[in-house]
Amino acid sequence: MPKYRSATTTHGRNMAGARALWRATGMTDADFGKPIIAVVNSFTQFVPGHVHLRDLGKLVAEQIEAAGGVAKEFNTIAVDDGIAMGHGGMLYSLPSRELIADSVEYMVNAHCADAMVCISNCDKITPGMLMASLRLNIPVIFVSGGPMEAGKTKLSDQIIKLDLVDAMIQGADPKVSDSQSDQVERSACPTCGSCSGMFTANSMNCLTEALGLSQPGNGSLLATHADRKQLFLNAGKRIVELTKRYYEQNDESALPRNIASKAAFENAMTLDIAMGGSTNTVLHLLAAAQEAEIDFTMSDIDKLSRKVPQLCKVAPSTQKYHMEDVHRAGGVIGILGELDRAGLLNRDVKNVLGLTLPQTLEQYDVMLTQDDAVKNMFRAGPAGIRTTQAFSQDCRWDTLDDDRANGCIRSLEHAYSKDGGLAVLYGNFAENGCIVKTAGVDDSILKFTGPAKVYESQDDAVEAILGGKVVAGDVVVIRYEGPKGGPGMQEMLYPTSFLKSMGLGKACALITDGRFSGGTSGLSIGHVSPEAASGGSIGLIEDGDLIAIDIPNRGIQLQVSDAELAARREAQEARGDKAWTPKNRERQVSFALRAYASLATSADKGAVRDKSKLGG
């Protein structure tokens, strides 16, 4: 009998009770010698990115059992950041990542499962499952629900592409008519799937490809397209092979920590920078690396950001391209191919298919492959039909986008910019760094200096922006919204969207110890570390202080003397128990969120829990 983890509950006379319960789930004597594989689903009717997942777990389970395994499905929670946005619900989004990771650990370890297929999709679900996978270190394959089709509507006699962010911006723009706002709202999110731009969900699903834990096409193949079904069928078959390789052949190369190595993490971050992914991916990669016991830090990200160019530009950084266009251009593998030809990737990595990076590129890079089936898969396109059904259409682009000079994905020679889409800035109130999505910053404001307008909650900042109290040239500072201070590190999509609505998108900066939605663009600097609630110097900024931002030189500076900052710190400490807390904010915080805050670290550590507080 192979040394399967599940043998703990399926073998031995003393496990008669456990076997009796397994039998009640449908298992038979023949099943007790097979690996038990958890199908970790995240179906919910609350989230368009997950509304179509109900039957997909069964699809995977059937393949697992046909290949000689026993499949057992369970679900995690899934928070929709877009619906939770702009009110107290956003306090729960980032903490849900830890809850998801823990719930996967609880279920898998409580029942001694041997391996997992993780069916994820949206913002915190993929990271939570990724953290759990690297924590547990048992064979795993990720297969996500896939991206939503881009919205489309006709405005001023022109067909334009839309997404969730457009609905937010137009809904708050006083110059937009009610009828146009309603038209955009009804058109922005037409199908099931994760929101159609390079937002957090799609960024993370792309990164699982670069980490080697999902199959080619996972990050870009539309949720509605019939071709996506094959990813689920393959995952069910392949996970049984990986499981048997590890348990029966003692092949540790099948384990996620050996696939998602430090070299793979560097490749994933390189991809993220090149494609202008969400800043949230920085948080999640840092957190996942800690679970894998990999020394991967903000310093590594900073080094990569200084040498990786931007080779792909997608909404929200441009409305020309959405995920369906990235797929047509070759998807994640297409971007990795250009990065490899530029000499920017670690080649000694493998994926869950057992392929090295060169082998993967040879087979799946549209610029290299001779496989017509692969080319056909990357021509999978949108149908433009409203639906919540997976695999419901089989439309295809007439041609691939293989124009590496002017297309969606560019070669090094024709890069959108020599600097990548993300940058780490350091300065006297961001000693441990902060993050900006440079892909979404207009060239005219890469260097920016202005007076601070300080707010101690997102709500106050939104009220000020919509009330006309923020003017061109201002630097909006929103603090005490970090992991501990919020708690929960809210996304600031509404403040950044409303700045655009008020015509200030290229005239103001926004700085926060909170974070941003993947849908954010503009001069939006987040993850300021240490956060205000941890004694960070962002808590010392006062209205009118000049703040200088210098993205090309990776700097951010509060133009106040060291002596003055020391005096302000002394005054803050003199507040005693009230030190490093908001002065005028009333916010009801539940016990669950207070428990999260008590262990939360700042963003530069991935906003994970501080194990040292538990003696770990």
From Swiss-Prot:
GO molecular function, one term: dihydroxy-acid dehydratase activity
Catalytic activity: (2R)-2,3-dihydroxy-3-methylbutanoate = 3-methyl-2-oxobutanoate + H2O; (2R,3R)-2,3-dihydroxy-3-methylpentanoate = (S)-3-methyl-2-oxopentanoate + H2O
Cofactor requirement: [2Fe-2S] cluster; Mg(2+)
Active site: 517
Gene3D superfamilies attached to this UniProt entry: IlvD/EDD C-terminal domain-like (3.50.30.80)
Residues annotated for [2Fe-2S] cluster binding in this entry: 122, 195
EC top class, as a word: lyase
List of residues binding Mg(2+): 81, 123-124, 491
E.C. numbers: 4.2.1.9
Subunit structure: Homodimer.
Function as written in the Swiss-Prot or TrEMBL entry: Functions in the biosynthesis of branched-chain amino acids. Catalyzes the dehydration of (2R,3R)-2,3-dihydroxy-3-methylpentanoate (2,3-dihydroxy-3-methylvalerate) into 2-oxo-3-methylpentanoate (2-oxo-3-methylvalerate) and of (2R)-2,3-dihydroxy-3-methylbutanoate (2,3-dihydroxyisovalerate) into 2-oxo-3-methylbutanoate (2-oxoisovalerate), the penultimate precursor to L-isoleucine and L-valine, respectively.
Protein name: Dihydroxy-acid dehydratase
